[in-house]
Amino acid sequence: MASKQIMFDENARKALLNGVDKVANTVKITLGPKGRYVVLDKSTKPVVTNDGVTIAKEIELHDKFENMGAKLVKEVASKTQDNTGDGTTTATLLAQSMIREGLKNISAGANPIDVKKGIEMATENVVGYLKSKSSEVKGKEKIVQVATVSANNDEEIGNLIADAMERVGYNGVITVEDSKTMETNLDVVEGMQFDRGFVSPYMATDSEKMVCEFEDPYILITDKKINSMKQIVPVLEKVASEGRSLLIIAEDVDGDAQAALILNIIRGALRVCAVKAPGFGNERKEMLEDIAVLTGGQVISEDKGMKLEEFDDYMLGSARKVTIDNNKTIIVEGKGDKAKIKERVSLIEAQINIADVEYKKTELKKRQAKLGGGVAVIKVGAATETELKEKKMRIDDALNATKAAVEEGVVIGGGISLFRAAAILDSLKLEGDREIGVKIVQRAIEEPVRQIAENAGKEGAEVVATIRAEPRELFGYNAKKDVFEDLFEAGVIDPTKVVRSGLQNAASIAGMVLTTEALVTDFNDEKDEKAATIII
């Protein structure tokens, strides 16, 4: 085992804070409608972005102890992104403030465990306050407002997302892809989504977003388990000879078959992704038939006297595009016969009418919605590739935020919902150092307002003082217009889930850092640096 270096107590906490500050200070300049951009140096060309989690993920520090702190605050951003898809910058800022103030108090003699407990109790109270102030999202206007704010106040994006939700429903499938022109527009096409992701992360074509995207793929559908390459060699030979990609939907793909597929993917010999079939039992068979009708393929099943080894071309389906991640698969514009798709939807409708069990009716309605509901495709256009990537990131953020708003409602934006929550913590009286934890949260939840103001070129302390002096709950600073006003009336709103999740994740990581007494890592020597460049 390699020898390790260890750091204790004050020195350990100081190193962690240095790492936290380097990430948070880089990320927080992007907060608000007048936040700045950060340029990331990529291997191909620089990327310009103001997306918090994208920036945080790019930061790797030379000092290994500081890098631990950086990784912890990156975890706040990543976890918030996974939960809600937005609010990563606010979460990072909250974590930095809690960690900085907490370490200051611990250095002065406060008990770390009690401070952590105080932070947890204060966070719980603030979350309760946010939920009590949350308003349900009703109507297109509110959807436009949420999407616009999350897209860095781009009204075009806000309207596009609202239109997309109006056409496919709040829970409908909405995808984002490149446009062949400079225009950004919306199109609704036939498609389907089901809750099954790839069987191995090695199948992702984009390792940053952890998604697999194929244009014009073949689709192999079977209700059998694939555990040997021999079963699918004829299919793979056809796909490879035509230079096409392949999506495999099967009961499972494991053993030698999965290992061989991954090896060929890594070597670049095949472009293949495998997912488990959706549903269970008879429901699975019906869902596979739905996919087959949509894509113009056949379900290869021994029930029909068909075997994978006896594959024929007509058994393969296809689609214009498929997108697969860890949890779901989206098929866009299946190449199936439109008349047969309508016929299949009508058949499901007839089954709904005669179903006598409520559960069965519900499942049939879900299948009908998936097959007949369609997919909204936002096609993003821009003058340059750099602008295109940045715009797609903003649309993804806005889309995720809007879905979060539909789920848990909205609260007043501009950092005001958290700012006003500070007052309710005055009544939370705790003993000893737990009270310090409450004060740390009180200070932290004022930071977003302060930072939004500073990014807009204002004096943060003055803006905070002006808002504090005004008793109206909805009163705040609108950085976009550079005015103080009723923010709810102005349409400055945030999804409750985004604000809540960011606060909880920040408090969780802050508690871990504040109770840390030692750091253990490898020595930062030349051998480590060389190892990073070795390819095996």
Swiss-Prot record:
Positions of ATP binding: T30, L31, G32, P33, D86, G87, T88, T89, T90, G414, D494
EC supergroup of this enzyme: isomerase
Any one cellular-component term (Gene Ontology): cytoplasm
SS bond list: none
Reaction catalysis annotation: ATP + H2O + a folded polypeptide = ADP + phosphate + an unfolded polypeptide
EC number, as in UniProt: 5.6.1.7
CDD domains for the chain: GroEL (cd03344)
Any single GO BP term: protein refolding
Cell compartments where the protein resides: Cytoplasm
Xref: PANTHER family: 60 KDA HEAT SHOCK PROTEIN, MITOCHONDRIAL
Protein name: Chaperonin GroEL
Organism: Methanosarcina barkeri (strain Fusaro / DSM 804)
Source organism phylogeny: Archaea, Methanobacteriati, Methanobacteriota, Stenosarchaea group, Methanomicrobia
Name of the gene this protein is made from: groEL
